[in-house]
A protein has these predicted regions:
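Conserved beta-strand in the GNAT
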Residues: 72-74, 100-111, 122, 127
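Conserved acetyl-CoA pyrophosphate-binding loop and the N-cap/start of the following alpha-helix
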Residues: 132, 136-144
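Conserved active-site alpha-helix within GNAT-family acetyltransferase domains
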Residues: 139, 165-183
Length: 190
């Protein structure tokens, strides 16, 4: 658990975070669709965000967090002024109505048992509410992921991730951390 300069605590995911976590996950998915691929890609990402997908995804997140504590971390902002501070509150609301804690981001490294997928640690997702970008919170999330990855028993001492080449902001962030192009991920429809 760490405290960022902006008063945002980075801590392990807890089951009570599920509703707020899901709203951030939606932001992640819709941002991929909207920001990196046009209307067709956005439509595909919107269409997959069904209630069934939500339940399956959150069940998987909880299993991963239980099996490998610390592989899923959240950034939680607390506002004591009663004015809210953006982000997503624990019931999935917009977080602007009171001074309670709000989830403003998350990072998800795959559990150690899944590291054989790439023979390395895998950063599955890192997402931050737009209001908190550029504040240092993403750096705290990345630090937590890297610390966790270093604790895993890995075939190769490396961490990999998938980032869309059109996502300039994310690519610049990962470049700052020394991520280099390593192979090429290709895909096709089933």
């Amino acid at each position: 658990m760490s405290e960022t300069p902006d008063g945002v605590e980075v801590r392990p995911f807890e089951p009570g975070d599920a509703a707020a976590f899901w709203e951030l996950k939606r932001g992640f998915e819709l941002g991929i669709g909207e920001g990196t691929g046009g209307d067709d890609k956005l439509s595909k990402y919107e269409a997959k965000l069904t209630d069934d997908y939500r339940e399956r995804y959150l069940s998987w997140v909880e299993r991963c967090a239980t099996d490998d504590p610390g592989c899923v971390v959240v950034a939680e902002a607390v506002s004591g002024d009663g004015h809210g501070d953006g982000g997503i509150d624990s019931d999935g609301g917009d977080g602007d109505d009171d001074g309670d804690a709000r989830l403003v981001g998350y990072a998800f490294a795959l559990p150690e048992e899944m590291t054989f997928i790439w023979d390395a640690a895998v950063l599955n997702e890192l997402f931050l509410d737009a209001d908190y970008r550029g504040t240092g919170v993403a750096d705290e999330l990345m630090a937590a992921v890297l610390d966790h990855a270093r604790s895993q028993d890995l075939p190769l001492d490396r961490i990999v991730l998938d980032v869309d080449e059109a996502n300039d902001r994310a690519r610049a962030f990962y470049d700052r951390y020394g991520f280099d192009h390593w192979g090429e991920l290709v895909a096709r429809d089933l």
